[in-house]
Amino acid sequence: MQKLFDEIEMPVSRVLYEMEKEGVLVRRQELQAYGDALVDRINELETKIHEAAGCEFNINSPKQLGEILFEKMGLKGGKKTKTGYSTAADILEKLAADNPIVADILEYRGLTKLKSTYADGLADYIEEDGRIHTSFNQTITATGRISSTEPNLQNIPMRTELGRLIRKVFVPKDNYLFTDADYSQIELRVLAHISGDEQLIEAYKSDADIHRITASKVFHTPFEEVTDLQRRNAKAVNFGIVYGI
């Protein structure tokens, strides 16, 4: 432990200090334009949702939304709780394919989250030097991973087109570039080495897709027929085992 502290943790703390001090440059005007674009789309969706429902209501109110969807519009699959119908994402996602209003509501929720958390939230952290100086936390997570707060710059969206656009407001200083480097499934490779699991070792030696292999076995599906969703779920299981699922 002393060796780990002296040779890894202490040198890393200096690097994190330099990263916090340097910060990351943000294009304030582009961030504002991004927020404005979100507002335009949010307003479009709000109008669309109200028209489909036949009345105006507070889309952000779970109680009102539940009553509109499951009582006024008669959608099937509603789950009633003590406080009203559940409008949790997992409930609505099951209804979205057959009910356009539900798909619009899910998009509305996603965009309002982007607006409040990123378009508005990040703007509050831009300092006089035009940079955001996040805090990197070295000793908070149980897994030993570094976390980021005020704001969290390690969780910038990338799954949707609008989500990815937020990344474009972060820019390097003149004559510099951003680079991206990531170990390929490092935790599972370490697990293969420590455990000595022959199948896992062979999978990595042959450059096989370990997540697709797991999905194939878990879902009893031929390897070639594994869907992207099944692979993502298997990936969560694989890494979950490493982190104590």
Regions found by a protein language model. Name each.
Residues V169, H193-I194:
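Residue-level signal for well-ordered alpha-helical positions
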Residues M1-E161, L177, S184-E187, S216, ...:
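Conserved "right-hand" nucleotidyltransferase catalytic core of DNA-directed polymerases
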Residues Y243-I245:
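A short, glycine-centered helix-capping/turn motif at helix boundaries
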Residues M1-Q2, E198-Y204, P222-V226:
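Short, polar/flexible loop-turn hinges at active-site or ligand-entry regions and domain interfaces
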Residues I59-N60, A203-K205:
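Conserved, non-catalytic sequence blocks in retroelement Pol enzymes and Pol-derived host proteins
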